Regions:
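PLP-dependent aminotransferase class I/II
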Residues: 1-177
Length: 177
């Protein structure tokens, strides 16, 4: 790390992680409480309507997504997902993953790989402090599902004002990768 900035050094030490979500220590997601309370109280009136719209968006998205390429059989009972979840089926080539990301980038569609935050938390640097680090072989065999999600899944924002034509555009792009 002598010639690089600390951020670049950490990024190069962990090429398998999204550089925007490398956690050097476990953290708490702290937010200011008063302003969030005011905003939250003002939005409670819309909660049921917003939850229904998110459920409808997600169900519609899954109904149009190619189930030969992507996992679409989620248990959606009681969910109100903030994201449209995209997971390539097991056996997908790394090139297919890269093509999905290039396509999303090319069309300025914001996404995050690995679903929440930094993907497989066992790959995060802070894990070493607890003696929980795993070898590549252990990750691939003992945590195969987590590794698949880490490497072959994304989420795109799902919000109450998301229009069907935007969902259709996203689905058409994904289905034609």
């Amino acid at each position: 790390c002598k010639r690089e900035s600390f951020k670049d050094c950490v990024k190069h030490a962990h090429p398998d992680l999204n550089p925007d979500f490398i956690f050097l220590s476990p953290a708490y997601n702290m937010r200011s409480s008063e302003i969030n309370a005011v905003l939250g109280l003002s939005q409670i009136k819309k909660l049921d309507k917003n939850n229904k719209k998110r459920r409808d968006n997600f169900d519609y998205f899954l109904s149009k997504l190619d189930n030969n390429k992507y996992i679409t059989d989620f248990n959606n009972a009681g969910q109100s997902n903030y994201a449209l979840i995209i997971i390539l089926k097991p056996g997908a080539a790394i090139e297919q993953r890269d093509n999905v990301e290039k396509l999303l980038d090319r069309h300025s569609i914001e996404f995050r790989r690995g679903l929440s935050g930094g993907g497989n938390q066992l790959r995060q640097p802070y894990i070493e402090k607890y003696g929980l680090e795993k070898t590549e072989d252990q990750l691939k065999t003992d945590f195969a599902n987590v590794e698949h999600v880490h490497n072959y899944s994304w989420y795109v924002g799902n919000y109450p004002t998301l229009e069907r034509d935007k969902i259709d555009t996203l689905v058409n792009l994904l289905n034609n990768v």
